[in-house]
């Protein structure tokens, strides 16, 4: 199957529901829909998948549903890096999702080059490298691919903004042809500077290019522990958000996350009018991965009910 056939085949998965897909919202059969739904980011299981080899990417939908009662998932491309254009593999993955009643929400894409590279040739190569993941995301029924506004830390604040906007605009145009969003996470460097990334979004000014605010990824420089205010940053990024990542590490005896005030954070999310998925991304070591996911889910459910 060539790329054109691949896109045409996957198009049937989006037809009839493209508008709903772009917002990340889904309807529940009967009952009142909560103001946000909970998804599971695959990175929450990175030790089980990457380090301990206890799970594979094909196990992920089943684990999300059977272990945690979650019916929406966010993939990490690192865990099936050589499968982006493996149609048989993607069909199997889609079949597993359908069997479990699990929706594929997005693919988090890393390792494909800097979309804001200082060299135009490398910047374009990074854009092209992401095409296969956009195609895979469409095939699986995702509404977005999550990408990085990486610049290599070359140039001034404004120069890096312009280059990131250029790469994202090019990728956004390609994703638009597929009915997909390209969304940027605050993920280190200047992308963790809320005002910088919000400025990039305004430069791009495309409806399908947005953000994925992560509650905890506001470290501009981890070596020096330079950190942007996470609440200010989230507030600055929420107007462009098409996904939200609920990062968690440690919990107190009451079940609250020690590093992030989830009530304050989710008030910001709700005030912005966001009604899509909030993805669990447990990254701590105090609890095992499964218990950390459960603790994050419980906290999200508690605060969601309080703010309803």
Give the ranges of each region predicted by the language model.
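N-terminal pre-domain/capping segments
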Residues: 2-139, 155-162, 166-169, 176, ...
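Residues at the N-termini of beta-strands
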Residues: 72, 144, 243, 276-277
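A short helix->loop->beta-strand "cap" motif at the edges of active sites that frequently abuts
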Residues: 102, 180, 272-276
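Active-site groove signature of glycoside hydrolases
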Residues: 137-157, 178, 183-187
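Basic- and aromatic-lined ligand-binding clefts that recognize polyanionic substrates
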Residues: 175-208, 220-223
């Amino acid at each position: 199957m060539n790329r054109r056939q691949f896109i045409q085949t996957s198009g049937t998965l989006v037809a009839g529901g493209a508008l709903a897909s772009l917002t990340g919202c889904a309807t529940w059969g009967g009952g009142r829909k909560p103001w946000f739904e909970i998804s599971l980011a695959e990175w929450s299981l990175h030790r089980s998948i990457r380090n301990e080899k206890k799970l594979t990417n094909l196990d992920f939908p089943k684990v999300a549903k059977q272990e945690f009662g979650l019916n929406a998932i966010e993939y990490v491309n690192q865990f099936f890096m050589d499968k982006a254009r493996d149609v048989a593999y993607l069909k199997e993955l889609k079949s597993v999702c359908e069997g479990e009643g699990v929706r594929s929400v997005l693919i988090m894409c890393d390792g494909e080059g800097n979309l804001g590279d200082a060299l135009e040739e490398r910047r374009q190569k990074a854009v092209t490298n992401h095409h296969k993941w956009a195609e895979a995301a469409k095939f699986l029924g995702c509404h977005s691919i999550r990408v990085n506004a990486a610049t290599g830390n070359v140039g001034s604040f404004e120069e890096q903004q312009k280059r990131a906007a250029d790469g994202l605009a090019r990728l956004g145009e390609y994703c638009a042809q597929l009915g997909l969003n390209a969304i940027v996470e605050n993920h280190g460097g200047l992308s963790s500077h809320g005002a910088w990334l919000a400025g990039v979004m305004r430069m791009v000014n495309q409806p399908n290019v947005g953000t994925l605010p992560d509650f905890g990824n506001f470290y501009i420089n981890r070596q020096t522990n330079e950190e942007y205010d996470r609440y200010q940053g989230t507030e600055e990024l929420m107007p462009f958000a098409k996904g939200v990542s609920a990062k968690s590490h440690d919990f107190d005896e009451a079940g609250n996350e020690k590093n992030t005030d989830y009530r304050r954070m989710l008030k910001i999310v709700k005030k912005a009018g966001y009604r899509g998925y909030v993805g669990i991304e447990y990254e701590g070591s105090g609890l095992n991965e499964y218990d950390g996911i459960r603790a994050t889910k419980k906290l999200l459910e508690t605060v969601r009910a309080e703010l309803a």
